[in-house]
C-alpha cells in the first residue's frame, strides 16, 4: 500500500472464517451536535463552547448561527428551519470530507432540535458515514430556563409537547396533549404559534380548560435569557385570551392541579409544583371526574 494513501487496511473474518483484507477510509473529520442554550452566553456549556471553538464548519438554522461570532478560517453553513434532515446530511458530508463540524441548535440539541435529524440522516445515509465520530453536547432547553425564572414549576412530573404540525399531524398533537392533561402533568408547550400556525396555541389552551381549573397557573416565557426577555404568570382563563400574544420565542407552561403561586408585592409571583402528590381529582381517562 502506498504509505501516502489516506486508506488503511483492516482484517476481518468473512462468513466462512477465512481471513480477508479490507480497506476502510481513515477518519479525520468529526461531528459535534451542540445547543447554545436559550439566549445568554452565560448559559452555553463549556463543552458546547469548546466544540464551537474547535470547529472548522458550523451548520445550522440562520438565526442560531448569527449568535456565534465570525472567525477567520471557519465557515458557516446557514439554512432554513424546514430543512433539518437536509441540513444534517450536509453536515455529515462535510465531516466525511475531513472537516470538524459543529451542528448548532438553540436550547438543547436533543429537545425538538437537530440531534434527532442528524441520526435520522445517518441511518438513511451511506455506510461510510457510520465511522464518523459523533458527539452530542447537552444544553439548557427553554423549559428549564423558564422554570428557573419562575421558581420551581417543574418540581413534580412534567412533559414537553411541540405544537408544530410541520413534522406530525395535528391529531397526533391533540391526542398527546389530551393524554398529558388527563394524567395531570405540568405541560411545557414548544413552538406554540407562528405566522403559518396562528390558531394552535388557542386550541391547545381551550383543550386544557376541560382538564384544569380556570385559576391554574400558566407561564408565558418569551426570549428567556435575552435582552427582550418577558415572563408572565397568568391564570388558565387569562391565557386563553392571551394566546395571540405568544410567538415562536415563547415557551408556554400549563400547571398541574397541584401547581401553586406565591404572590409578592411589587414583583411577579413565584410558581412551584410540590413534589408530593395526593390523588388528583383530574386524573381520569376522560378528563374531569
Question: Where is each model-derived feature located?
Answer:
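Class I S-adenosyl-L-methionine
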Residues: 21-134, 140, 279-286
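Short, solvent-exposed amphipathic alpha-helical segments in soluble enzyme
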Residues: 47-51, 69-70, 118-121, 151, ...
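A contiguous loop/helix-start segment that scaffolds small-molecule binding in enzyme catalytic cores
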Residues: 21, 31, 182-289
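A cross-taxon signal for low-complexity, glycine/charged-rich
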Residues: 1-4, 10-18, 24
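Short beta-strand segments
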Residues: 34-35, 103-106, 137, 161-164, ...
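Class I SAM-dependent methyltransferase SAM-binding "motif I" and its flanking Rossmann-like core
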Residues: 23, 111-183
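A polyampholytic, Gly/Pro-enriched intrinsically disordered region
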Residues: 99-104, 152-163, 181-185, 237-248
